[in-house]
Structure formats: C-alpha cells, structure tokens
C-alpha cells in the first residue's frame, strides 16, 4: 500500500448575521491577502519583528538564522525566490510590523465573517462511495457510506477507474454545475485526505495530491499537521481537532471551501477550481500499521433542502 504523496470558536447561531453565499469568495480573497501579507514564509506564523531582505521578501527576525547558506555565514538564501542577501543589508520593516499588528486585532472579526453559513446545508448531497474506484485494501460498509483501510487485499475486479496503488476512493455523484455540500465524519482518525478531484485524474500508480494535478484536498498527518494541497503546501491552523468536516463546492464561483462542521469555523478555501470537466468527491483514510485504521463516514442528510440535480457516474452529462 502506498501513502498518498503531498508536495512540499463560536457555535452557529440561527439568529446571527452570516455572509451571503454570493459574497463569500470576496471575503475569502480578502482574508487570503491579509494572511499572505502578515505571515512569515519560514515559520508560517504572524511576522514577528519583520526583516526585509535585499530581494524584498520579509521574514521574522527569529527566522533569519534558518536562511544561512553556511553555518555562521553572512549570506542568506531567501526561501521564496532563492536570491542571496547579505546579513548586514537586511532592514527592519516597521510599516509592515504595524500592519501585522492591525491584522492580528482584526482576526476575530475575519473568523466571524468566514464562519459557515447554515444555508449551505440546503445544498447537501445524498452521497455514497463509488466502490468501482476503491483501492483493493479499502473496506467499504454495505451502505457505501463508510470506509477504512484493511491489511488484506479484497481482490476486486481490475477496472480502469480503480485506484491500484494509492489507497483512496471517489464519491458519487459527480458534479458538473451548481452548489453542493456534504460532511464527512473523521472521528479520531490521525490521518486522512478529503476534498474533490477531476474525474479524469490518473488512478494508476502512486498519485500526488496537488492542485496542479487536479486534486483540491485538505489533509491531516500525525494527528495535528493540517495542510491544503497547494504547491507548495499551505499549512493550516485550526482552533481544535476536526472531527466532522464540511465541504462546500460552488461550481459557478469555482471554489471549494472546508469547514469545521461542528463549530462552523472556516478552515480553507480553494479558488479557481477547474469547472471544465466533472468533479468527484475524494476520500482517503489512514493506512495501517502506521495509521490508526480510522473510519471515514459520509454523514446522512440532515434536511430535505433542495440541491442542484447531480449526475451519477455513467450518466450523460
């Protein structure tokens, strides 16, 4: 079995004011700009006493030594653009330091703006697992809603759409348009991958979860390291361990957002998600013996809200 490769709060209130779904992408863009401007590319935390390199990039003062080309040397290699700066030519960036201070003050408001809108659940999909795509080491429940990794191959039929090396599975239905929402219970699992992918992704051989290859996923490793499948990886910070993940796909706006479905907190949003071909739900549980054999379960429908009519695999687009 092969591990998938990764390339290197307040509760919801029905009476609260939530961001309209149509303006959510704009808020995400704003939050992303704030995060990019205030984050250190070395430690991924807020910039602390930011120092500007000769190339114009900025890092924390405490992270400067990690850029040394040689121990105790004066040359600093930028981790963003690979340009070399002289230690005696770096300067404090006071203006950016003040900006970061303001952004830290605004963080609670940004979190509230990006909180999950309960109306997203109107678009909940009656989803099942597509057994024809399942890797042979995956054990699937009879109702096609839960999956975990096993130690013994299931000797399923060798199909063109089946993942033969990477231990993962696709969900059904496929999506060609509209808005769609679903939740996955990850329980206490310490490793998992969830999201969407192009229907045409390569399923033979070891796969890499990257947006460039058609995977828009959030992954958990070692019980605490959460990341998005951007290139390079975007490491994510959450207030608490995720146990139920909400995924909202908006084909029209070309974005997919991830939430802590229990608290409503925003986790991450991919923008510019390709809508040129159908997308499929993607799931990958942990792998024993290093993994914990955690179960991923698709949560049942919570209401009978309307959804855009999905297209099942094999049906005409």
UniProtKB/Swiss-Prot annotation:
Keyword Zinc-finger: yes
Tissues/organs with expression: Expressed during neurogenesis in differentiating human embryonic stem cells and in the developing human neocortex.
Keywords associated with the record: Cytoplasm, Host-virus interaction, Metal-binding, Nucleus, Zinc, Zinc-finger
One biological process term in Gene Ontology: regulation of gene expression
Alphabetical list of SMART domains matching this protein: PRY, SPRY
CDD domains attached to this UniProt entry: SPRY_PRY_RFPL, vRING-HC-C4C4_RFPL
Domain of life: Eukaryota
Role description: (Microbial infection) Stimulates the activity of Human Immunodeficiency Virus 1/HIV-1 pre-integration complex.
Protein name, entry field: Ret finger protein-like 3
């Amino acid at each position: 079995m092969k591990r998938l490769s990764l390339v290197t709060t307040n509760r919801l209130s029905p009476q609260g004011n939530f961001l309209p779904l149509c303006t959510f992408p704009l808020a995400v863009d704003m939050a992303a700009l704030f995060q990019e401007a205030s984050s250190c590319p070395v430690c991924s935390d807020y910039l602390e006493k930011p120092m500007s390199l000769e190339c114009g990039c900025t890092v924390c003062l405490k992270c400067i030594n990690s850029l040394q080309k040689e121990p105790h040397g004066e040359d600093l290699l930028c981790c963003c653009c690979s340009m070399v700066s002289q230690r005696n030519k770096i300067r404090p960036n006071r203006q950016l330091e003040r900006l970061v201070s303001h952004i830290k003050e605004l963080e609670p408001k940004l979190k509230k703006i990006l909180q999950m809108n309960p109306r997203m659940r109107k678009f909940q999909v009656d989803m099942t697992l597509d057994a024809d795509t399942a890797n042979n080491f995956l054990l699937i429940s009879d109702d096609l809603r839960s999956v975990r990794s096993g130690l013994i191959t299931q000797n399923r039929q060798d199909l063109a759409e089946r993942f033969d090396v990477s231990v993962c599975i696709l969900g059904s239905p496929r999506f060609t348009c509209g808005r769609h929402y679903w939740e996955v219970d990850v329980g206490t699992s310490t490793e998992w991958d969830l999201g969407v992918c192009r229907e045409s992704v390569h399923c033979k051989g070891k796969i890499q979860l990257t947006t460039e290859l058609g995977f828009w996923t959030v992954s958990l490793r070692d019980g605490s390291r959460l990341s998005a499948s951007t290139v390079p990886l975007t490491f994510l910070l959450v207030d608490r361990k995720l146990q139920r993940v909400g995924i909202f796909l908006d084909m029209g706006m070309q974005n997919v957002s991830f939430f802590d479905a229990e608290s409503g907190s925003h986790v991450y949003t991919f923008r510019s998600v390709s809508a040129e071909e159908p997308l499929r739900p993607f799931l990958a549980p942990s792998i024993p013996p290093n993994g914990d054999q955690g179960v991923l379960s698709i949560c049942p429908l919570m209401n009978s809200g309307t959804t855009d009519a999905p297209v099942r695999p094999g049906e005409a687009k």
